[in-house]
């Protein structure tokens, strides 16, 4: 409904609660997507509170780590900390108060489009190359690799930290825990926000054991026979790990997505 964390887009969704209720009456449940990144926005009270209380992951020098996702530059909640999980979980209240009963946690590996530092270095390199009127293969393919290397760069995952009871831990060493801890933040919050009620929750990134808080789906895939086979093989595997609620984008949503293939 919005790219900010604390409010709804009233122009597009003037009465989101009524929309959810009307859809439910038609047998359709509204399931909003919740991303891990919180937009860098000084006017957003959720963002300000997260900064003031130190709930976000930090760089080696202790300043908040920033990288871009869908809303642009964002901070990332330190889900390994119980108090940060509790704080993030409370943010679902704006939606549960509207009668929304299901949530889709996404981009929670966390996915990173780029970091400001790496983007600046890319533009500086591109500017230098732009002054040439003849790029050789090394220049050209180096530029291509640098574009592709902006997303989910290992260097970025090595550049921020979590605060734990055992001390500061660099993110890349606990990367696989992050999505599962976001799942836990939401699942534990729903015990308070929607007591004695069932809440649909599924996530793109998770860990074994997080099935006690929510389900999982197998993430983004291509519309190809090889990835369809991979999904068929993976779903029983995650179910054997406890994720009885699991699924996949069976028809895919990139490459050859003709409707006839989906019907097969």
Please describe what each predicted stretch is.
Residues 1-261:
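Catalytic-domain carbohydrate-binding cleft regions of carbohydrate-active enzymes
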Residues 264:
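Calmodulin-binding IQ motif helices
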């Amino acid at each position: 409904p919005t790219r900010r964390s604390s409010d709804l887009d009233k122009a597009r969704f003037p009465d989101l609660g009524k929309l959810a209720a009307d859809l439910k009456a038609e047998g359709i449940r509204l399931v909003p997507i919740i991303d891990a990144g919180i937009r860098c926005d000084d006017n957003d009270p959720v963002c300000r509170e997260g900064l003031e209380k130190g709930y976000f992951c930090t760089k080696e020098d202790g300043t908040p780590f920033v990288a871009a996702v869908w809303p642009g530059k964002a901070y990332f909640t330190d889900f390994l900390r119980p108090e940060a999980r509790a704080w993030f979980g409370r943010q679902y209240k704006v939606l549960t108060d509207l009668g929304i009963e299901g949530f889709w946690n996404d981009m929670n590996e966390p996915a990173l489009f780029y970091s400001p530092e790496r983007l600046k270095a890319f533009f500086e390199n591109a500017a230098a190359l732009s002054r040439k009127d003849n790029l050789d293969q090394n220049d050209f393919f180096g530029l291509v690799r640098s574009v592709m290397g902006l997303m989910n760069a290992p260097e970025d995952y090595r550049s921020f930290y979590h605060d734990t009871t055992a001390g500061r831990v660099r993110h890349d060493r606990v990367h696989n825990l992050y999505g599962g801890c976001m799942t836990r933040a939401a699942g534990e919050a729903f015990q308070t926000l929607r007591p004695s009620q069932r809440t649909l929750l599924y996530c793109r990134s998770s860990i074994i054991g997080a099935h006690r808080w929510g389900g999982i789906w197998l993430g983004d895939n291509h519309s190809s026979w090889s990835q369809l086979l991979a999904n068929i093989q993976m779903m029983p595997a995650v179910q054997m790990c406890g994720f009885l609620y699991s699924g996949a984008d069976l028809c895919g949503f990139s490459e050859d997505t003709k409707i006839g293939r989906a019907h097969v």
